[in-house]
Amino acid sequence: MGERLAGKKAVITGGASGLGVAIARMFVEQGAQVALTDINLAGAQKIADELNASRQGCASAHAHDVADEEQWIDALAKANTEMNGINILVNNAGIGTMGSIEQESYANWKKVMAVDADSVFLGCKYAMQYMKQNQPGSIINMSSIAGLYAAASMPAYNAAKAAVWLLSKSVALHCATSGYQIRSNSIHPVFIRTPILDGITDALGVKTTEERDKVLTRGIPMRRIGEPEDVAYAAVYLASDESKFITGIELKIDGGMSAQ
């Protein structure tokens, strides 16, 4: 086990699947204690049990709809009690929809904005009180390459992830100018091999994951889909004291796509 995050106490939303699981596993491997929150409590508890089997008492699970303000207040209070402090927040939970501006419904627009953008505002706002008591701290907000580059087929997702990008900078400036030792940064992955890609397979009209990957990697110079660990390594760096002079940045994990 490493020690890059020894003594750190992290809240990770969307901790039952995908990137949340990869980040939680790597945080624990590096010595952190984690509180996994998810609307799927059973899934989050399963991951917490797995982590506790490797190091007893390193993980807990909490039911949490990230679009609900009161649930944010409750989940953070419980996590703070469970871990005796919070100094890392990973706003990872998110959803996506496909469809042009003419196809997208207002209901879907509001849902994506609530889960992907409002949740980050709520997390940053309500975690701050705990993080100020446990400095230094790090806020890591999961945006997307789609928050920097638009596509005709995902207006709601583009808008929500772009909001996360600039909100992260606003929070970084607030903390820095307030004298808080709390950093705020955003991560911007391209296509990562998680369950969210399943919906893209159908939208592309292809039948196999191999066909899907071939289509999706056409614009990626490294010609591959990202792995969850690619994002988790970045999260460990931003959570650790190794990045103590880094705040307000967008870290792109895109296989060179944005370099073109």
Describe the residue ranges of each PLM region:
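Active-site helix of classical SDR
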Residues: 124, 160, 168
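Short, small/polar-rich loop/turn modules that mediate ligand/substrate recognition or access, typified
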Residues: 176, 181-183, 246-248
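Substrate-binding pocket helix/loop in short-chain dehydrogenase/reductase
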Residues: 100-101, 105-110, 139, 212, ...
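Short C-terminal tail/terminal secondary-structure segment
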Residues: 2-4, 149, 236, 247-260
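Residue(s) in the substrate-gating loop at a strand-loop-helix junction
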Residues: 144
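Alpha-helical segment proximal to the catalytic Tyr-Lys
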Residues: 129, 173-177, 244
